[in-house]
């Protein structure tokens, strides 16, 4: 009955129950007629009316009409007993008060039994119909659930109750031997361990596999993904249990296993008190707030409830979107101020800093696309170098306490304009820190973030959807990858640790071959490598075969926090950096900016 609308289902159940409770008392009377001396038709009508009213009141009290009866179990039977017993007792009391006669208990006992048999039987009939006669018409996909714990049980029951999910749980698997062969709910048993999945998929013609282990680690997820990769089978996972328990997400809001899940790492436990001291009840400004990293920093900052957050960006649409999102989530507790401004506009940056006097600035505004900046090198200088200089000097003038610049691994030994512009931006930050004791300037350096705008993942996904080929520059090219939320959280932690002048380097894990990334995406799309061709296009201008997070002279062996290192980066004086910038602006060339960034003279 779950495929019917809620109102129609309620109406049908109420109508069936009305017929049962109205006529059962008359049937009971005729069964017991030889024993009656005082009962009349009027009294039977009174009893029928009382039963009709009291039953429907009890049904709503015990929520009988909002159950998925096609999956009824003992708990639903207990509800029927409670509702029927309550209505019989109420009727017995009403009739006794009205007539003044002692209640005829056998009549009520027979009526009670008929209610249980007929009402329970109507639900049982529907269950049998759905299971053996009508199930196929609902076009549910046979589903295997990985994990038979609390989350898995919750998910299976939700699938049974919801036709909207279009999933039919067939069985579960779990590596816990104590759960083997147990029945989670009628018809759904734990039938093996995770390694048995391929055999079980073939045996039961499974179309969907759902990982119902909310606290699963990344390495375990990789193992399960490798086991579950089969043609025509989609791998999904349920949301985190914390999101379900908090009400932020429903248990049935499943998501595909993405490459971000496979390349991401187990989250670092942050020093929440330290970060809270930096953000809570403070005014925070984020440049590039509409971008991939900038917008996630804004979300993470708002989780600590600053007094005000200033969303500064050049693109009005992206600022509109993040402003709307944050207002919906945090608008009651945080003053959210969207500002359309360009970091290249020096006067505007000074005006904004002076007006709002932020406690901390997270500078995420930057051009980051290597080939585009090779074709437009002057824009890299204006935005990444001069924009950083304007924003940082405005922050210094307004006596901002913390200035955190988002840098990149491409700033290490840069062979291209984009990386060189970010290295010179780091020089600006460090030199300004030497000039003031009121603002702590710091840079945080990390590699590629998964899923950011302009990254290879959206490109590869698009190419796979179009049937290929997937274009990779070189079979041996590697990159470091990190998820956007992880990078943003570590940026906040690094900012809280900053004492001034540091270039923090985030531990990016092991580098990943781009071709392996492409192969993973092809598998996750449900296709074989043979279905989608991979072609090699050659290294583009300014690209490196591999990236470095620190050069050999910058390596610092000790972590200052889990996954955060302090790079031993060479400092330059403010007047030296100023001279470099003036030379680049007055007589620009690609070679000059790259040479300066690598510690060589301009020419």
PLM features: residue spans?
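Signature of alpha-helical transmembrane segments in polytopic membrane proteins
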Residues: 1-139, 167, 230, 237
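Conserved Rossmann-fold NAD(P)-dependent oxidoreductase catalytic core, especially the SDR/UDP-sugar
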Residues: 231, 247, 363, 367-370, ...
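N-terminal Rossmann NAD(P)H-binding glycine-rich loop of SDR-like oxidoreductase domains
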Residues: 284-302
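Conserved Rossmann-fold cofactor-binding substructure of NAD(P)-dependent oxidoreductases
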Residues: 340-360
């Amino acid at each position: 009955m779950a495929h019917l609308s809620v109102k129609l289902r309620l109406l049908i159940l109420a109508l069936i129950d009305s017929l049962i409770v109205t006529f059962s008392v008359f049937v009971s009377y005729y069964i017991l007629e030889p024993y009656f001396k005082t009962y009349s038709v009027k009294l039977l009508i009174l009893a029928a009316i009382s039963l009709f009213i009291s039953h429907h009141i009890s049904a709503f009290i015990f929520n009988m009409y909002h159950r998925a009866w096609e999956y009824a179990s003992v708990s639903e039977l207990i509800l029927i007993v409670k509702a029927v017993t309550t209505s019989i007792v109420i009727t017995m009391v009403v009739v006794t008060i009205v007539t003044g006669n002692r209640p005829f208990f056998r009549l009520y006992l027979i009526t009670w039994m008929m209610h249980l048999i007929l009402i329970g039987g109507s639900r049982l009939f529907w269950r049998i119909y759905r299971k053996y006669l009508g199930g196929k018409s609902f076009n549910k996909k046979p589903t295997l659930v990985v994990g038979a714990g609390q989350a898995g049980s919750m998910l299976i029951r939700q699938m049974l109750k919801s036709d909207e999910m279009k999933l039919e749980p067939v069985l579960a698997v779990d590596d816990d031997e104590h759960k083997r062969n147990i029945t989670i709910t009628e018809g759904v048993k734990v039938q093996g361990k995770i390694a048995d999945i391929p055999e079980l998929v073939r045996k039961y013609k499974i179309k969907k596999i759902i990982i119902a282990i909310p606290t699963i680690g990344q390495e375990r997820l990789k193992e399960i993904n490798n086991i579950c990769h089969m043609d025509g089978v989609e791998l999904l996972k349920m949301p985190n249990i914390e999101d379900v328990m908090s009400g932020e997400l429903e248990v049935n809001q499943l998501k595909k296993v993405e490459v971000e899940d496979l390349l991401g790492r187990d989250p670092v436990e942050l020093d929440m008190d330290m970060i809270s001291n930096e953000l809570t009840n403070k005014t925070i400004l984020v440049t590039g707030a509409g971008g991939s990293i900038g917008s996630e920093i804004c979300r993470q900052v708002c989780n600590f409830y600053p007094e005000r957050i200033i969303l500064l960006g050049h693109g009005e649409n992206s600022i509109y979107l993040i402003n709307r999102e944050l207002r919906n989530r945090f608008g009651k507790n945080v003053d959210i101020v969207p500002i359309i401004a360009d970091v290249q506009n020096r006067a505007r940056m000074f005006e904004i800093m002076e007006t709002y006097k932020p406690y901390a600035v997270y500078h995420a505004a930057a051009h980051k696309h290597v080939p585009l900046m090779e074709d437009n090198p002057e824009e890299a200088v204006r935005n990444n170098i001069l924009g950083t200089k304007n924003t940082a000097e405005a922050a210094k003038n307004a006596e901002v306490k913390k200035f955190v610049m988002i840098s990149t691994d491409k700033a290490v030994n840069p062979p291209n304009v984009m990386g060189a512009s970010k290295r010179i931006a780091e020089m600006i930050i460090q030199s300004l820190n030497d000039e003031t004791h009121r603002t702590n300037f710091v840079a945080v350096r990390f590699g590629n973030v998964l899923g950011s705008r302009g990254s290879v993942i959206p490109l590869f996904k698009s190419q796979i959807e179009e049937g290929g080929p997937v274009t990779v520059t070189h079979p041996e090219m590697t990159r470091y990858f990190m998820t956007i939320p992880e990078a943003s959280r570590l940026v906040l932690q690094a900012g809280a640790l900053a004492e001034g002048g540091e270039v923090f380097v985030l531990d990016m894990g092991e580098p990943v071959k781009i071709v392996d990334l492409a192969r993973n995406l092809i598998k996750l799309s449900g296709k074989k490598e043979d279905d989608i061709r991979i072609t090699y296009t050659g290294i583009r201008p300014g690209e490196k075969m591999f990236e470095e997070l620190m050069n050999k002279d910058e390596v610092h062996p000790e972590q200052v926090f889990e996954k955060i290192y302090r790079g031993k980066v060479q400092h330059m004086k403010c007047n030296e950096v100023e001279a470099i910038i003036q030379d680049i602006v007055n007589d620009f060339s690609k070679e000059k900016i790259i040479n300066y960034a690598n510690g060589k003279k301009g020419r």
